[in-house]
């Protein structure tokens, strides 16, 4: 699998949201991904009952750790009308075949297609999680907080994951003009 990047430009994020708005399901998936730090496998496993209170408690599939977090306004604005006629036991991102969520591959295609249409490359489902980490870091400059939110084992891993390390290296190369 190719390396994917966070989406650092908020205008590009907005452009992707506008593109995805034609499908409330796809827009909600992208919005939750950007605002929760969840991996795509955890996003796809969410049910209506897990989110309708506005607070999520779930066990992450990869780490088996319990994750708790409130759903912010960006998520709730898309979520509330989307789940209005859905039952608690329904998957949020149900496939058209019914009874199951869409596949990780389908989610990948949705995000990849939207990002391409908006002029971005090297963006995929994992970019949503990376974008969350990047934006938390940009807002707080607290890499320990980012590390905790992403369940990483070290600050260095988090910096590399969100693309900060490479950005700093690139800037040094650009600034040194001998």
Residue ranges, per PLM feature:
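Conserved catalytic core of the tyrosine transesterase superfamily
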Residues: 1-178
């Amino acid at each position: 699998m190719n390396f994917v990047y966070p989406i650092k430009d908020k205008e590009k994020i907005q452009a992707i949201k506008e593109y995805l708005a034609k499908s409330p399901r796809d827009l909600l998936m992208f919005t939750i991904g950007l605002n929760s730090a969840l991996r795509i496998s955890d996003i796809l496993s969410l049910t209506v009952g897990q989110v309708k209170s506005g607070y999520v408690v779930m066990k992450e599939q990869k780490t088996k750790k319990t994750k708790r977090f409130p759903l912010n306004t960006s998520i709730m604005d898309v979520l509330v009308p989307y789940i209005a006629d859905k039952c608690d036991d329904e998957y949020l991102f149900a496939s058209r075949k019914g009874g199951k969520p869409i596949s990780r591959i389908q989610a990948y295609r949705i995000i990849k297609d939207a990002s391409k249409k908006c002029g971005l490359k090297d963006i995929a489902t994992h970019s949503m999680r990376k974008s969350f980490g990047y934006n938390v870091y940009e807002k707080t400059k607290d890499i320990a907080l980012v590390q905790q939110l992403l369940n990483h084992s070290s600050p260095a891993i988090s910096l590399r994951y969100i693309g900060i390390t490479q950005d700093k290296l690139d800037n040094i190369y650009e600034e040194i003009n001998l």
